C-alpha cells in the first residue's frame, strides 16, 4: 500500500514433480521492481503481451471452439472448418495425457486417453468428443468424456491443454516492443466462445522502446480472441501450467486499450 495506491501481486506453480520456489520469488520481485512507479498507459490499439499467468484468458475461447458438443449445436465458429487454417501458423495446440498435473489413463467412459493434436501450425485437425458426441459427429470418441459431477452424464472436456511454446524469453519479447502493455493479472471473466471480451487489468505495465517503464492503472483491454491470435506477434519459451492449461507468454495485436487518468 502506497497512500491510496494498492498493489497486489500473486504468483505460484502447478507441477507434478518438484517445485521451484526461487523461480516464483524472483518473478514476484521482478514485478515489484517494475511497479515502483505508476505511468500513463497508452491508448488505442497497441501490442499486448499476456504473461503465461494471464494468457489462459485467450485459450479458453479456443478450448470452447474445439468442443464437439459446441460443434453439434452450431455454436463453434469452426464447426465446418476441419482441415482449414483457423488461426496463426505458429500456433499448435495439443492434449498430452501424461504431461501435466491433470493426467489420467482414461476418461469417465472408460476410453483410454491419448495424445491429440487439435490445431497444427494454425490448421484445425480435430474436435474433442465423448462417446455420444463422437457418434453423432461420425468421428468417434477422443477419450474426453468426463462427468461434471456424479449426478451428470459425461460431456466433452479437455485436460492437459498444451500450447506449444515459441523461442523467446520474456526479456527478449519485451525488448522487441516499442510501445505496449504487459498484462500480468486480470479482473473479469473469460471471453467465451464468441471471442469477444473486455477485461480490467489488475496488474499491468507499460513498455517503451523495449524497457518496462512502470505500472499502468485504471486500464481495460478489449477485443476479440480469434482476431487477436490471427495477429499473433510471438509465443514465448516460458511455458507454465495455469490450471490444466500449459501456455507461454503471448504477444498479440488487434486489441484496444481504454484508460482513465486520475
Description of each model-found segment:
Residues 1-62, 66, 126:
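Internal alpha/beta scaffold segment
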Amino acid at each position: 500500500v502506497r497512500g491510496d495506491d494498492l498493489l497486489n501481486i500473486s504468483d505460484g506453480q502447478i507441477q507434478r514433480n518438484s517445485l521451484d520456489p526461487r523461480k516464483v520469488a524472483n518473478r514476484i520481485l521482478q514485478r515489484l521492481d517494475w511497479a515502483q512507479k505508476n505511468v500513463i498507459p497508452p491508448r488505442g490499439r497497441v501490442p499486448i503481451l499476456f504473461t503465461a499467468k494471464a494468457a489462459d484468458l485467450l485459450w479458453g475461447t479456443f478450448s470452447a471452439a474445439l468442443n464437439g458438443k459446441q460443434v453439434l449445436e452450431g455454436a463453434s465458429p469452426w464447426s465446418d472448418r476441419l482441415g482449414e487454417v483457423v488461426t496463426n501458423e505458429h500456433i499448435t495446440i495439443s492434449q498430452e495425457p501424461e504431461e501435466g498435473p491433470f493426467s489420467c489413463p482414461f476418461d469417465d467412459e472408460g476410453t483410454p486417453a491419448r495424445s491429440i493434436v487439435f490445431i497444427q501450425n494454425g490448421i484445425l485437425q480435430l474436435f474433442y468428443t465423448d462417446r455420444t458426441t463422437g457418434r453423432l459427429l461420425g468421428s468417434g470418441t477422443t477419450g474426453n468424456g468426463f462427468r461434471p459431477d456424479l449426478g451428470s452424464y459425461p460431456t466433452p472436456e479437455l485436460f492437459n491443454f498444451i500450447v506449444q511454446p515459441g523461442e523467446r524469453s520474456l526479456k527478449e519479447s519485451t525488448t522487441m516492443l516499442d510501445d505496449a502493455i504487459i498484462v500480468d493479472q486480470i479482473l473479469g471473466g473469460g471471453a467465451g466462445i464468441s471471442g469477444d471480451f473486455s477485461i480490467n487489468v489488475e496488474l499491468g505495465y507499460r513498455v517503451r522502446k523495449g524497457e518496462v517503464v512502470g505500472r499502468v492503472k485504471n486500464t481495460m483491454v478489449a477485443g476479440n480472441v480469434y482476431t487477436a491470435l490471427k495477429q499473433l506477434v510471438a509465443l514465448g519459451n516460458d511455458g507454465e501450467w495455469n490450471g490444466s492449461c500449459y501456455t507461454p507468454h503471448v504477444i498479440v495485436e488487434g486489441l484496444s486499450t481504454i484508460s482513465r487518468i486520475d
